[in-house]
From Swiss-Prot:
Residues 314-324 have a biased composition (Polar residues). It comes from the Eukaryota. This is Y-box-binding protein 3. The gene is YBX3. Found in a mRNP complex with YBX2. Interacts with RRP1B. It comes from Homo sapiens (Human). Disulfide bonds: none annotated. Gene3D superfamilies: Nucleic acid-binding proteins.
Amino acid sequence: MSEAGEATTTTTTTLPQAPTEAAAAAPQDPAPKSPVGSGAPQAAAPAPAAHVAGNPGGDAAPAATGTAAAASLATAAGSEDAEKKVLATKVLGTVKWFNVRNGYGFINRNDTKEDVFVHQTAIKKNNPRKYLRSVGDGETVEFDVVEGEKGAEAANVTGPDGVPVEGSRYAADRRRYRRGYYGRRRGPPRNYAGEEEEEGSGSSEGFDPPATDRQFSGARNQLRRPQYRPQYRQRRFPPYHVGQTFDRRSRVLPHPNRIQAGEIGEMKDGVPEGAQLQGPVHRNPTYRPRYRSRGPPRPRPAPAVGEAEDKENQQATSGPNQPSVRRGYRRPYNYRRRPRPPNAPSQDGKEAKAGEAPTENPAPPTQQSSAE
């Protein structure tokens, strides 16, 4: 029983072994002898290396990849250096011609009289007032000569002693106005808080600054605050409304200050001599009176026969001391055609006088006698 139990424990302990331990324990066992002899161990040796390379968590593959990339970059850099080999530095030359649209031209070297190709990307210091990189025809420049694909090329092009190049006259200039210049609000200058505090402090203390300080402060204010002159004047009302007062009768009276100054004569009947009586004056400056035709006066219609007789009767009944009836008065329509009795009272309620003759004359006596 004891031997069987020991065998069971040994089997249970060997089952849960990790694969790494099994792999580590495998090389310790002696390798089986093969009939070939020494050739078998040489063939079995590369197996661990293949296992490490195939392991996804291993570091051998990324290291090899990074090394290959670095080597390729170094090779490319070396090839570029080999292509852009520097032949001369700080060489002076004269621009033969330069096309701004295409962006390339040629420079004639002063030492060897050789034409060197120049591209706009080779210009190192451009004119700050120019929008595009360029060099002007006949301009003296300083540059480095490098070996290009088709011949000598210019690089690091600047003016003499490293100053910016002048540029071509055909190149576009940059905009001259400052950003936001036209968007500024044009109005009177703003008051500075510091100046207001200084003025307030001087007035509160109760003494005036000396004359020299006033001169300096005035000059400083002129420098700080530019004089603002409006281009047009704003008038709310016409000038004839200024200095005048209006009353209920629409009479235009001068300002009291003008009366005190003696510009207008004495007052007569409550109205000064210089004042003029005018029609109704409107305060609204946009008011326009209605158009009235100024033609000849219209003729009045001739009075009717009955109206003429009434006027004669009124003149006869009214005495010399009685006031005349106002003009334009017309009697009602009902009283026009009524026959008036001889002794009827007049319109004013007074009876006709005894001495006055009746309005209707009697028939002549000759006719009466003949009738009898």
